[in-house]
A protein has these predicted regions:
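Conserved ABC ATPase "signature" region
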Residues: 19, 23-26, 30-48
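Conserved signature/switch motifs of ABC ATPase nucleotide-binding domains
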Residues: 51-54, 72
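The conserved cystathionine-beta-synthase
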Residues: 178-210, 214-228
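ABC ATPase "signature
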Residues: 137-138, 146, 214
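Catalytic Walker B motif of ABC-type/P-loop ATPase nucleotide-binding domains
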Residues: 77-80
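Short coil-to-helix segment of the ABC ATPase nucleotide-binding domain corresponding to the Q-loop/switch region
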Residues: 12-19
Length: 228
């Protein structure tokens, strides 16, 4: 588990904080320190093993917290607003680090946040909760395009549709034999906007190596300016 407050022990070094869960489990010192060194390197803190928390920045302290949660090799990784106490630049950096670790480790992750933009950037599926009850579970695109309740609609009202709508959602059937390029079916409009807008020809929409439709600049612009 990783929490909003890092809860590092101030009298312990980085390696001692990271190895602490293994110490509690009774793992031998040489084994727990070897494992701690592995995850310290994994989260980008190699060379800071003997630093105390007061010698680390906020982002570095959160990396120690992340390393500590990974040292026991959990099957389920639970993060409760882990980046909300960080300033915007460091927060973005930690989100990038989170994505890198997820791509590397392939763990099941439950990530708690009040920031919907953070949720759509990090999550495959999102559960929107109100008063302790789940209002809707869906992928980001479905939450924005087909909200199940008024609360979900209001919660997602201000999100940029270009961040969640995918090429396959607004593509049209193949009509021409001249194209400006290809885009993935699951790429968001934000990701393909520059590529498609800059071409006078439509782009093929691809899935598993097959052409499933086309998308042109007018369809992309409609989403960018908020026209359905």
């Amino acid at each position: 588990m990783v929490f909003q407050q890092f809860a590092l022990l101030p009298h312990l070094t980085t390696i001692e904080n990271v190895a602490f869960p293994l110490d509690v489990q009774g793992v031998k010192k040489e084994v727990r320190e070897a494992r701690a060194l592995e995850v310290i390197e994994l989260v980008g803190l190699k060379g800071r093993e003997n630093y105390y928390p007061r010698q680390l920045s906020g982002g570095q302290q959160q990396r120690v917290g992340i390393a500590r949660s990974l040292v026991v090799e959990p099957d389920l990784w639970f993060l409760d607003e882990p980046f909300s106490a960080l300033d915007p630049l460091i927060r973005r950096e930690m989100q990038d680090e989170f994505i890198r670790l997820q791509n590397l480790l392939k763990k099941t992750i439950v990530f708690i946040t009040h920031d919907f933009d953070e949720a759509i950037r990090l999550a495959d599926r999102i559960a929107v909760m109100k008063d302790g009850e789940i209002e809707q579970i869906a992928d980001p695109e479905q939450l924005v395009l087909d909200p199940a309740t008024d609360y979900v609609a209001e919660f997602t009202r201000h999100v940029s549709r270009a961040k969640v709508i995918k090429a396959a959602t607004i593509m049209s059937p193949i009509k021409k034999d001249q194209f400006g390029g290809e885009v993935a079916h699951d790429a968001t409009i934000e990701e393909i906007a520059d590529q498609v807008e800059g071409s006078k020809f439509p782009h093929k929409v691809m899935r598993d190596g097959q052409v499933i439709g086309q998308i042109d600049s007018s369809a992309v612009v409609n989403i960018l300016v908020g026209r359905d």
